[in-house]
Amino acid sequence: MNICLLGNNLTNLVLANILLKKKINVDIIYQSKSSSLKNTIRTIAISNENYKFLRENIKGISNLVWPTEKIKIYSAKNKSSELFEFKNKNQSNFFLLKYIKLYNLMKKNKSLKFINLKNYNLDDIKKREYSLIINSEQNNPITKKYFQKKIEKNYKSLAHTAIIDHKKIENKI
């Protein structure tokens, strides 16, 4: 089985690493463009269950995470107004990690095959005879041509964004 993943992003890198572990051939096809990843300071949080899954499937992730037992979400307008709190006794709720470190860890797999195309279209990709094509890149020409105008958009969605402010903790490892 040959699978094509469109986009050089964290979603595809994690998926590719797991598929390769199951002996499935994977190509990551992407368009060359200047990457802003090198300078990103993004931190992401993953749930306890997702961390367990990644730890079982990806070597070295344990060294990248900071477990958290409690996270409080505050209002942006009134910083003393707590909206809600996630906490579990004796168990980590989330694991924080730097996006770029996880991205670089995923990219280290020597079995990954990256195909950089200046301009790609569906016909070029079909010629490669993939069993399955997965597109996780929202701003590529294929998405724009075949899906953007056909998908009904509903912007009545809710997203939580947070800036975490905490006291510095000295690791004695």
Protein language model regions, located:
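A generic structural signal for short, well-ordered alpha-helical segments in conserved domains
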Residues: 16-17, 107
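Receiver (REC) domain switch-region micro-motif
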Residues: 3-4, 133
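Flavin-dependent oxidoreductases
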Residues: 158-173
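N-terminal FAD cofactor-binding segment of flavoenzymes
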Residues: 38-76
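N-terminal Rossmann-fold NAD(P) dinucleotide-binding loop
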Residues: 12-13
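Short beta-strand/turn micro-motifs composed of small residues
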Residues: 7, 30-32, 75, 135, ...
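Conserved N-terminal helical subregion
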Residues: 56, 66-147, 152-160
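Glycine-rich FAD pyrophosphate-binding loop
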Residues: 4-8, 17-42
